[in-house]
């Protein structure tokens, strides 16, 4: 395999330096999906902690002379191998956006692509693979309060994202093999937000500008975990560093959140009011909203042979907005020493300040 791709190593490399060759292997890593929201924050923290970093992605999302970029398809082992050769740790955080409805893309990236990542890691001699999973792998649209990692995988996943995240996490954890010096772990964040977030805040403000944020689903008391992006990154790095000291941690999943559950609508309202938009005032009973969303989904399905309709008002989104779903971080605290670096108050303030360009003029 190495000979087959040695001549390809320059093809996918876009920019960067040879720093990756000047650092001890223990501090060399590759971030798959490093051009994305979470990936960019991960690269920044890794660099600040003295790591040499490769980024593998379908595009180069930023410029940094301290980073080596490799562009390619993660389903293609020849594209992937040069980015993984010579590193000790791979952070795999590539995934289509969770709000997509492209089943084929989810299966290709999260399932097929992850299998390729696992095989290529083994070929390249990578010692640790840390996956960005999701707490949604145990969520079926009903209340979860202080859920632990012992909860079973969802039997009825709420969407293609969750469905393929379950397959992805299982594949990575099952690949753990201490005898062959290949250790894996999965980090399960929930509701990632922060500066440069391309989804939560921009989508929320777009809805507010269109007058779609006047109503809240349910009584507004349902607690949910939202997690600041820097805390998510911190959890990944802790997992990798503790795996180096304790191989017994391999094959495990860890919930990583801000450890401060907050009412779903309170969180959204803080973002909205921080950017000078009105918070939702009116309540729609949860069951009414869910029933209406269910009827709409049936209508969309019936009409699908004639016309393609994209709707954001789905039973899944109603469940996300109207149920309790927050998770225990005790396992991560005990086994990898996790503590959030940034509190919810500071995280919301920093996020709001970073989106000043979306602020509504008073």
UniProtKB/Swiss-Prot annotation:
Q: Which residues carry this modification: N-acetylmethionine?
A: 1
Main localisation: endoplasmic reticulum
Which pathway does the protein contribute to? Answer: Steroid biosynthesis; zymosterol biosynthesis; zymosterol from lanosterol: step 4/6
List the molecular function annotations (GO) for this entry.
3-beta-hydroxysteroid dehydrogenase (NAD+)/C4-decarboxylase activity; oxidoreductase activity, acting on the CH-OH group of donors, NAD or NADP as acceptor
**Keywords, sorted A to Z:** Acetylation, Cholesterol biosynthesis, Cholesterol metabolism, Endoplasmic reticulum, Lipid biosynthesis, Lipid droplet, Lipid metabolism, Membrane, NAD, Oxidoreductase, Steroid biosynthesis, Steroid metabolism, Sterol biosynthesis, Sterol metabolism, Transmembrane, Transmembrane helix
Q: Gene3D superfamilies recorded for this chain? A: NAD(P)-binding Rossmann-like Domain
Query: Where does the chain bind NAD(+)?
Result: 165
Query: Which residues are annotated as active site?
Result: 161 (proton acceptor)
Q: What is its EC number?
A: 1.1.1.170
Localization (cell): Endoplasmic reticulum membrane; Lipid droplet
Pfam family membership, one: 3Beta_HSD
Motif Prevents secretion from ER: chain residues: 359-362
Tell me a GO biological process for this protein: cholesterol biosynthetic process
Q: Does the keyword Lipid biosynthesis apply?
A: yes
Q: Which GO terms describe its cellular component?
A: endoplasmic reticulum; endoplasmic reticulum membrane; lipid droplet
The reaction(s) annotated as catalysed by this protein in its Swiss-Prot or TrEMBL entry are:
a 3beta-hydroxysteroid-4alpha-carboxylate + NADP(+) = a 3-oxosteroid + CO2 + NADPH; a 3beta-hydroxysteroid-4alpha-carboxylate + NAD(+) = a 3-oxosteroid + CO2 + NADH; 4alpha-carboxyzymosterol + NADP(+) = zymosterone + CO2 + NADPH; 4alpha-carboxy-4beta-methyl-5alpha-cholest-8-en-3beta-ol + NADP(+) = 4alpha-methyl-5alpha-cholest-8-en-3-one + CO2 + NADPH
Q: Which residues cross the membrane?
A: 289-309
Q: How does it sit in the membrane?
A: Single-pass membrane protein
Q: Which PANTHER family match?
A: BIFUNCTIONAL POLYMYXIN RESISTANCE PROTEIN ARNA, SHORT CHAIN DEHYDROGENASE_REDUCTASE FAMILY 42E, MEMBER 2
On assembly, the entry states:
Homodimer.
Q: What does this protein do?
A: Catalyzes the NAD(P)(+)-dependent oxidative decarboxylation of the C4 methyl groups of 4-alpha-carboxysterols in post-squalene cholesterol biosynthesis. Also plays a role in the regulation of the endocytic trafficking of EGFR.
Its family remark reads: Belongs to the 3-beta-HSD family.
List the protein's name: Sterol-4-alpha-carboxylate 3-dehydrogenase, decarboxylating
**Lineage, top ranks:** Eukaryota, Metazoa, Chordata, Craniata, Vertebrata
Gene name of the encoded protein: Nsdhl
